[in-house]
Structures are given as C-alpha cells and as structure tokens.
Amino acid sequence: FRNRLLFPVHDVRGRCIGFGGRVIHEGDLPKYLNSPETPYYRKSLVLYGLYQGMEEIRKSREIICVEGYLDVIRLHEYGFKNAVAPCGTALTEQHLQLVKRYAERVILLFDGDDAGREAARTHGRLFLPHQLEASVVMLPDGSDPDSFLLDHGADAFRELLLKQMPVLDYLLQQTLSKYPDSLQGKLKALDELLPIFAEIKDQTLKQMTLNAVAEKMGLPTSCLLYTSDAADDSGC
C-alpha cells in the first residue's frame, strides 16, 4: 500500500477488516489494490460504505450501489449517505443477501461508458430471481458519480435519480436496441433474451414481460412463450 490513498473497509459492526488502496501517481502500477482475503475480510460479503450509511439505509430502505470507493465518499459528502460499493469485485449473490437485510430497493448507478453499461447489464440480471426492487441509472457519457456531483451538484444528481429505469426494462431495452428490426436481428435478440426470461421466477411478471417483448418485436406471444418454456426445460 506504499504511495497509495487508503480506504478503510468496515464490517456492519464498524470493525476495520481490510483496506482498499488507490495509487497516487499513476504509472505501471495497478490502479487499485485490496487487502488479501482473510476469515474476517471476504470481498464477496462486504460492501464499502454500508456501515457508515446504515442509519440512512434503514430509514429509507434504499441503497445506491456505485462502482468505487471515491464515488461512495463523494455521494456521502453531498448527502446521499445510502451509497455503497463492492470492494474491487462484481456484485455477488452474497452481496444481495446482505442488502436484503437492510433495504428493499437498490439503485444501480454506473459510469457513462461502455464498461458501465456492461456492468449495469451484468449486475442487473443478478437481481431478477430476487424479491428486491432494483433499477438502473446511467450517467452521461464520460461521467462517473464523483465527477458528476463535482460538476453539477446535488440537485442535478437528484434529478438524475428520478430517471431511474426498472432493471428488467433496462435489460430489455438494451438488448432490443442492439439488433436491427429484421428476422435475423429478432432471432439474435431472442437468443440473448432467453436467459433473462429464465431468471424471472415470478410467473405473472414473466408473462407480462413476454407480452411486452412480443409486442415490441411484432411476434405472437405464443411464439415467445413456447421458446421460453423450451429454454427452461433445457436449462438455458
């Protein structure tokens, strides 16, 4: 951790269990380093900022999940004290179980670049089997939460949060927009959507989703229902 800015990581009881370190003078060194895992510090079980934001999270029953340590610190500084981030890893099922102990809603807030959009898709799918309300907010191109707050302030950030999109709607929109409105394009989109359908455990929501996608694709719902059921049976 020499010549690095250190971020103490706490468990839910407030005990310091590890550190994240950001390089001060960027060069050939890795930008971030984290403490090695121990019986007390396991990255898949810890969210940075959760302990510090516990009071606000319990009150609002909502969490804003961002990508990095500096994003969490900036959000807390500007009054958004329910912000958390994974410690140098992707969100995991264990993280979701931790979140469900304290919150009912999660806002996924990612950087406005290709990596951020991919993270929103990957992390968003993780929520589909769970009874946990999740939505996605994408920042403008080239922005991250830290820089957006510095450039535009808290009021603009609140307005941005109002534009959140339910995670399932986001996944469908992102997938359908990738392909042309042709037979081949629809087949490719459907192939990518099948695993998403399979992860929706609520049957009413699944049927509503199939209806909406069928309408957008100009296909009969029975076609999507048959394809989805076949994919479920094959373990897709």
Descriptions of predicted regions:
Residues 226-236:
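Single conserved hydrophobic/aromatic residue that forms the stacking wall/gate
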Residues 80, 142, 233:
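ATP/adenylate-binding site constellation spanning eukaryotic-like Ser/Thr protein kinases
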Residues 1-102, 106, 119-120:
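Phosphate-handling DNA/RNA-contact segment within nucleic-acid enzymes
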Residues 11-12, 54-63, 90-106, 110-228:
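A charged alpha-helical hairpin associated with nucleic-acid processing machineries
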Residues 23-24, 113, 235:
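Short, glycine/serine-rich, charged loops/turns that create anion-binding
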